[in-house]
């Protein structure tokens, strides 16, 4: 996995330097659970946290990110949380 993470880091940096608009979403461990509609999103979430999130919540975040201007040219970690998706993205 270390090789994957290094390649991912380099790809993310290349995208950031490209001049293109981007949003990089880094979800935690993906679960086969129903969505809650509530997340935690931050530039960095410590590894000692419960880093799980449902696939459905990740999909919701990806769709909302298409129209939420506050996430343009940002990268963020994403896990299950207590904040509604729209609010969490606005607060990044």
Description of each model-found segment:
Residues 1-92:
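Oxidoreductase cofactor-interface core, primarily capturing Rossmann-like NAD(P)-dependent enzymes
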């Amino acid at each position: 996995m270390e090789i994957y993470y290094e390649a991912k880091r380099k790809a993310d940096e290349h995208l950031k330097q490209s001049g293109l608009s981007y949003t990089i979403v880094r979800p935690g461990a993906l679960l086969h659970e129903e969505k809650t509609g509530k997340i935690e999103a931050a530039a960095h979430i410590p590894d000692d946290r419960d880093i799980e999130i449902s696939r459905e919540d990740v999909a919701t975040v990806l769709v909302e990110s298409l129209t939420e201007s506050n996430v343009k040219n940002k990268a963020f970690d994403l896990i299950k949380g207590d904040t509604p998706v729209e609010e969490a993205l606005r607060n990044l």
